[in-house]
């Protein structure tokens, strides 16, 4: 393998990592904004713009990166609305904070994950088919 080819592969890897990090950052921003649209913050108008960064992020990259981005959105938005849940679980069961966080990740993934992941896959499919050739 030539030095030029190795450099091109390294640059492509760096672009992929940067793209994934930007997508995850967009998912976190969307999750926070979407979570603030619900009580206790009650900023309902944010729900209309909260999904824009997420929708832009899942259009680019691979399907696995889009699904990871959607999962991060699910967990972050669930945590913004239910930050009390991990502590309540750990206090109720007499376990440490790690048990509460593990229960939170499991429940937020099981409750919100399938719908968000299915929507993400369908949205990517429609967006790719609607692209002009």
Q: Which positions does each model-derived feature cover?
A:
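Membrane-embedded alpha-helical bundles of multi-pass enzymes
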Residues: 2-133
